[in-house]
Amino acid sequence: KRQSVQGSSHRPRLAVFKSLKFVYAQVIDDLQGVTLVQANSGEPEILKKLEGGSKSKAAARMVGEALGERAKAKGIDAVVFDRGGYIFHGRVKEVAEGARSKGLDF
């Protein structure tokens, strides 16, 4: 059971996960338990644009931007940011800034 950050259908949760190779982000409605939108740095359209690696800060920013665009297309304007226990720095911060740059409010 989630204790700290809880999303709803009006304001879903934007969760970030970092692996050793990729950065993942998804928007989740915790009341229904479904993922509404997702993006990761392993997607071909993101990998094509990258010059660093799939785990770089530039990749994380592109993941945030892609997620922001997809969320806006689905009518999601505001989210609750769940940094997943990571400090708000580096790749996690870049995902947040990328999503904010596309108009997502949190």
Indicate residue ranges for each PLM-predicted region:
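Ribosome large-subunit tunnel/peptidyl-transferase-proximal elements
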Residues: 1-106
